[in-house]
Amino acid sequence: METINKLQAGGPKYFMKDARAASTDGDPVRYPARTTLMDYEAEVAVVIGKQVRDVAAGDFTPVIYGYTLANDWSIRSNVSFGPDFQYSKNFDTGTGLGPWIVVDESIDPLDIPVGLKVNGEVRQDGNTDQMVHDWGAFGAHLSRDLTLYPGDMILSGTPKGTAVDSFKREPDGTFLDDSAFLKPGDVVEVFSPLLGTLTNEIVKAD
């Protein structure tokens, strides 16, 4: 989708999320102590239903078992795509998934609306039809020389409207206004008419 695909001009790029970082609907999400700039990313996740390797792009849709919503909680502290990117994406409760897995063959994987609210205010409003590289391209790219297993998930990337999108920065990367970033007590909802609503409250880390 728009934001992540700015990184994908030469083809799909990806990073791994640790399964131990997962959270689900209703879970409190811990504000990472390593940053003061916590962001949200509304995404759609496809759930793999078959063990595959080196799958062709045109053969990927039958591999999909179902769909769920995701919030790719992110740290925005002068992070670039590289080793530090992994650090910014993996922390306890840092991958929101839910509220359930929808199994429905009538769903078009390239026409799933997804949006996000913070404290009731709509911040993101997108659709998987905005993906520059479709699910088949991602599946073919990821499964080349790497086996995908049932239960694995691939996330779509996020539409425009994240906090990091919202405000201009100084040449040194300092934000002129950080008010769009999340704070403890904020309630964040990822929503889709096809997949439900994933709701989490941000809390201070223990």
Positions of predicted regions on the chain:
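Active-site microenvironments in enzyme catalytic cores
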Residues: 1-122, 203-205
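Catalytic-pocket segment enriched in acidic/His residues
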Residues: 6, 76-206
